[in-house]
């Protein structure tokens, strides 16, 4: 559990920064232990008025913070590094302050090369669903991060949804599946709504049906995954584990029925190949945007 005394500085009050701020407050974090750095005056006023949080400069926000979350766009990271380095220089022990980056493509080695030696760095990739507390954040830790520090960061992001950990080498793949993933689902909903209108539904009804169907299907899948995890704990070593999505699809598909007819058309249209190509393209683009150490 994240210490109630740990001060958290959020650098950047955009959508992800606000999602983390609101999530931490919902989880019971005291507003006095949170501070935000935001350069846009209108945005700063909005955050201060909405959450009663202190909004200040980067240098002031970082001072005395145990965790510094860099939630700016990748193109803005370089501009805040000077302030972060300056603040770290006056700190008593840089190893006590953990820097967490949620900026896409900004690598741990890049940040370690800019900050004082031994600074703990964690890379995080949340997705857009964090805005409603239902996201998933994937974390990768740097070489100077202690076990307790990493547990604290896990607890921090648990306030905005699920949390997974991977080696940093997999973060581009994570970006392609999860970071960009919500847009894939929105596009699928768009297509499903348009198809619903084409067969006689109103757009409002089709949208409600599509959205609720997506939400319910996701809930079914998550429940099955929990059941499978429990089964795996008692299963013999090496036992085959089925893909839960495939299990559920088979369960609700009656031979010769309407669902089978629809799935046949999706397979004939190359849905799997298109999804694979999309994820590959996103991964390649993430690699191209990567910011590494000089």
Swiss-Prot record:
Organism placement in taxonomy: Bacteria, Bacillati, Actinomycetota, Actinomycetes, Mycobacteriales
MF term (GO), any: pyrroline-5-carboxylate reductase activity
Family label: Belongs to the pyrroline-5-carboxylate reductase family.
Protein name from the UniProt record: Pyrroline-5-carboxylate reductase
Chief subcellular location: cytoplasm
Localization in the cell: Cytoplasm
InterPro entries in the record: 6-PGluconate_DH-like_C_sf (IPR008927), NAD(P)-bd_dom_sf (IPR036291), P5C_Rdtase_cat_N (IPR028939), P5CR-like_CS (IPR053790), P5CR_dimer (IPR029036), Pyrroline-COOH_reductase (IPR000304)
Keyword tags: Amino-acid biosynthesis, Cytoplasm, NADP, Oxidoreductase, Proline biosynthesis
One GO cellular component term: cytoplasm
Catalytic activity as recorded in UniProt: L-proline + NADP(+) = (S)-1-pyrroline-5-carboxylate + NADPH + 2 H(+); L-proline + NAD(+) = (S)-1-pyrroline-5-carboxylate + NADH + 2 H(+)
HAMAP family: P5C_reductase
Gene Ontology annotations of biological process type: L-proline biosynthetic process
Pathway(s) this gene product operates in, as recorded in its UniProt entry: Amino-acid biosynthesis; L-proline biosynthesis; L-proline from L-glutamate 5-semialdehyde: step 1/1
Function comment: Catalyzes the reduction of 1-pyrroline-5-carboxylate (PCA) to L-proline.
A Pfam family hit: F420_oxidored
EC number: 1.5.1.2
């Amino acid at each position: 559990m994240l210490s109630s005394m740990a001060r958290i500085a959020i650098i950047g009050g955009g959508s992800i920064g606000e999602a983390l701020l609101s999530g931490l407050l919902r989880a019971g974090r005291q507003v006095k232990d949170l501070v935000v750095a935001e350069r846009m005056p209108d945005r700063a006023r909005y955050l201060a008025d909405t959450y009663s949080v202190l909004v200040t400069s980067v240098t002031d926000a970082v001072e005395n913070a145990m965790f510094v979350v860099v939630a700016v766009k990748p193109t803005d990271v370089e501009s805040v590094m000077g302030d972060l380095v300056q603040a770290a220089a006056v700190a008593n022990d840089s190893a006590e302050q953990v820097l967490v980056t949620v900026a896409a493509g900004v690598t741990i080695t890049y940040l370690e090369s800019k900050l004082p030696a031994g600074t703990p760095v964690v890379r995080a990739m949340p997705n857009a669903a964090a805005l409603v507390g239902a996201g998933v954040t994937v974390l990768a830790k740097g070489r100077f991060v202690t076990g307790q520090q990493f547990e604290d960061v896990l607890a921090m992001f648990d306030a905005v949804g699920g949390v997974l950990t991977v080696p940093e080498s997999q973060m581009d793949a994570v970006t392609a599946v999860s970071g960009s993933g919500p847009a894939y689902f929105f596009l699928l909903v768009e297509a499903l709504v348009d198809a619903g209108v084409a067969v006689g539904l109103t757009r409002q009804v089709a949208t409600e049906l599509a959205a609720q169907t997506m939400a319910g299907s996701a809930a079914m899948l998550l429940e099955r995954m929990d059941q499978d995890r429990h089964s795996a704990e008692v299963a013999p070593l090496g036992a085959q584990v089925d893909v839960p999505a495939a299990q559920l699809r088979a369960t609700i598909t009656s031979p010769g029925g309407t669902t089978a007819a629809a799935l046949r058309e999706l397979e004939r249209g190359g849905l799997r190949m298109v999804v694979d190509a999309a994820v590959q393209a996103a991964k390649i683009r993430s690699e191209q945007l990567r910011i590494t150490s000089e």
